[in-house]
Amino acid sequence: MPVSYSRWDRRDAADRNAMGAAALDLCRAMRAMDGVDDSRFYWTGTDSLVLLTHADGGVLAAPPSPQAAAANFALGDLARQTSAETWLDPSQGMEMYSRANG
């Protein structure tokens, strides 16, 4: 099952409480999408957090729901996304490699 990882750093003028609330709203919007098993955020320091979302196959590659997109922009107003990755489990990685090499 793929995992989406993103790291967010608070903008200088942003309120930490508002940033946490925006991250929670994004997680809730993600969990409401079909195929998403879990979405949570974790503080990694006083000014940064990480979001982890576990979802089925193509859900993470598809456009987000309108609610998830709005929540993503709301978080973006308060924090800068400094990195984002999608992690594949070993079987998915091997499947992708096999398709690429026919």
Placement of each model-derived feature along the sequence:
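Amphipathic alpha-helical interaction segments
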Residues: R16, G35, V50-L51, Q81, ...
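An amphipathic, aromatic/His-enriched active-site/gating alpha helix that lines ligand/cofactor pockets
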Residues: R28-D37, H54-D89
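Short, well-ordered beta-strand segments in beta-rich or mixed alpha/beta enzyme
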Residues: P2-D9, S39-A69, G102
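Short, low-order "capping/linker" segments at domain edges
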Residues: W87-G102
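Short, surface-exposed ligand-recognition loops at beta-strand->loop->(often short) alpha-helix junctions
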Residues: D9-A21
